Amino acid sequence: MNDYPILLIHGTNCRNDGKHHYFGRIPQMIEEQWKKCYLLYGDAWGTIAHNCELYRWQIKRILSSESCEKVHLIAHSKGGLEARYLVSTMEFAPFVASVTTLSTPHQGSRTAAIWEKRPLRLHFIGRFLEMYWRQRGDLAPDVVSVVHSLTPAAMAEFNQNNPDVPGIVYRSFGAVLAQGHRDYGMACLAHCLTHWDGETDGLVSPDSARWSKNHQLLSGVSHRDVVDNRRKKSHCNYDWRRFWYLLLEWLAEI
């Protein structure tokens, strides 16, 4: 059994700071069941490379303060790509025991490709989002670059440049929404994206979330509820406490 610290990496259009951080009640639960849990702080609309530069120094400080050899990375949505980039491109593999990704678009999003074909709209919305998130702490938001990086073509290149590193345990989880789900925002998005991406959790399709041989599909849960972002009952069979408890048990055996 190991007790390496657990580091949580957020996705796009959210930050890990502020009164209502990204992972809901999960950090408190991990602290109760585990030794240490840390939130990593990146830009809401930072590129993968930019956010990983921010994470690099945070991880080094954690390794030093905890006097530990390695950490576990648990990352949601685009954060899963950043976790893989840290290990492969930034050569953090010696300091990472495992990488767990939750609803991460490893194979890209057709919806992102559609947005890229509408550059005027994308630039207009991007300017608004960048202004908004700069006021909330983003250092270098870049919506257009982030959207491009999530297209299937860009992700194919990313996957080629960031293969799994031997010695690190990878695990991925995808999700798909159920009818009657109470996360109405994600349910609406899922309906809108059906034409391009098929079934999704509201943003990411199960096929895109698949990575590594160790993969599991969560049925009836939304993109946000995987990480308790809404802090509400998901009105399905998904029990976030049980899911995270089992995940911690699995990490303890690595």
Predicted regions and their residues:
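Glycine-rich, phosphate-binding/catalytic loops in enzymes
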Residues: 23-26, 89-92, 116-119, 189, ...
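Short, solvent-exposed loop/turn segments at secondary-structure junctions
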Residues: 12-14, 44-45, 80, 105-107, ...
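Active-site catalytic motif of lipid deacylating hydrolases and related acyltransferases
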Residues: 1-70
